[in-house]
Amino acid sequence: YILTGWYFVDSLAIMSIQPGTLILGDSASGGTLIVRRGAKILAAGTASQPIVFTSRKAAGQRRPGDWGGIIVLGSAPSNKPTTQQVEGGFGTIPNTAAMYGGTNPDDSSGVLQYVRIEFGGIAFSQDNEVNGLTFGAVGRKTVVDHIQVSFANDDDFEFFGGNVQAKYLIGWRSLDDCFDTDFGFSGKLQFVLEKRDPTIFDASASGSSNGFESDNEGSSPYAAQPRTSPRFSNMTIIGPAADSAAANALNAKWDFTSMLRRATELSIYNSALVGWKKGISLRDTLTQRAAIDGRLEIRNTSIAVPTTPLLTSTSPATGDIAGFNVTNWFNTPSFNNHGSTVRQATDIVPLTAFNLSNSFDPVPAAAGELATAGTSYTTGRLAGDTWFTAVSYRGAFDPSKPMSQQWTAGWSNFDPQTTDYANGVTAVSESKNELPLEFALDQNYPNPFNPTTTITYSIANAATVRLTVFNVLGQKVATLVDVKQGAGKHNVAFDASELTSGTYIYTLKVDGAQAARKMVLVK
């Protein structure tokens, strides 16, 4: 498929994209996919058949900004008016077409699973680029996991308000920040990888390139409610420099692993932040106050940078609030953080974490700090939250497994510049036998149907299976399976005699993973 111009999925409509689909973004028209408020996208790829959005150009000719990107707009809360138009250069279209925000934290914009987004971020005007993947007030019922954004010409992922929750994200060699959170975003992220390229950075006059950046809002006094307050856990954030020599050679635009400012309450847990010149910056008094009050937390986290690990707006140690010392705060014994003094990135991640190809391997040593320093999911702002998967290691990768058995296996691509897409999408894996547990959810048959149809799915190992049917409002109308089943193919009959005509979505959950498809009942 060729994506040309601004392609809007209209409110109440559903766009379905099948596993293995290849969508090429057109440069001349700035191909961009916008899922409007009230619409849904159902893009459920698999580890062996990811869905790929990429440049229309040939291998070797692709560049950041070759096309637009993906923008998903929802009805969850933000701290901006619901008439706000999303960032991205849409000044020439009707304002209502790109609005976002509402009052429903349980809003669903659909499903994004096993999706790659490559070479997006076309500039519609000076300093006005589309991000790789933009979420505008997207709600927590939206399913987001296994997403890779590569070579974005702005941010990889940007969250404007909303509370979407996502796991297994990759940001690869982007221009600006990997993650940018604004306007009251209060979602959750876990198992996140970022890797940066020393030759790709924001060289604009006002720009800088950070690991992630977070603001409550862009204008003083930064007091809008709800506050930007996401929780990030198990992040592996790898900058462009493996050691002091590489850091000293970086352009001055390379800044922080994490820039937290303008009253944000973003919190970081169980993570590894390495490879920049500088570490975490609590940029202003409002952000420092959030740290003092326990609304902004950094716990069980390791930093490895060669110059200044912790900063405020005035100096490396002393902040703008009398008596606040960011290093002392970070070193609070119960926080169990590491890295308040300078050290090399390779002290906690391997040198192969700085490879810029499919030989990239960030898996830490089995006896190293990230494996042994400790984690926690029961204290502070994580207390009582069962969404996070508790693991014993810091960062995104299990030190006991090789890269070929990590969650990135099969579907990710760390060298999209040279990938030949002439024959469509293929999985990137040295051995399919090394892939983790997979499952497949087939299209129901018949479809459309009246009143019965059959849903078929396959699981590779015995597992707990839940097969559920929802209407387009996200309301559950039937639970077809909720039991442990053996490996193999399973067929389930669905009788919709008691339902009205319309579109329904059936979801399959297997041990935490999920896929979804739509079906149409016509009476």
Question: Where do the PLM segments sit?
Answer:
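Extracellular beta-rich repeat passengers
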Residues: 2-14, 27-38, 45, 54-154, ...
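Beta-strand-rich interaction surfaces with strong enrichment in secreted/lumenal proteins
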Residues: 4-7, 480-484
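Glycine-centered coil/turn sites that cap beta-strands in beta-rich domains
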Residues: 429-445, 449-470, 490-496, 510
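Short, surface-exposed loop/turn motifs with a glycine/proline- and acidic-biased composition
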Residues: 462, 481-517
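Short beta-strand edge segments in extracellular beta-sheet folds
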Residues: 519-523
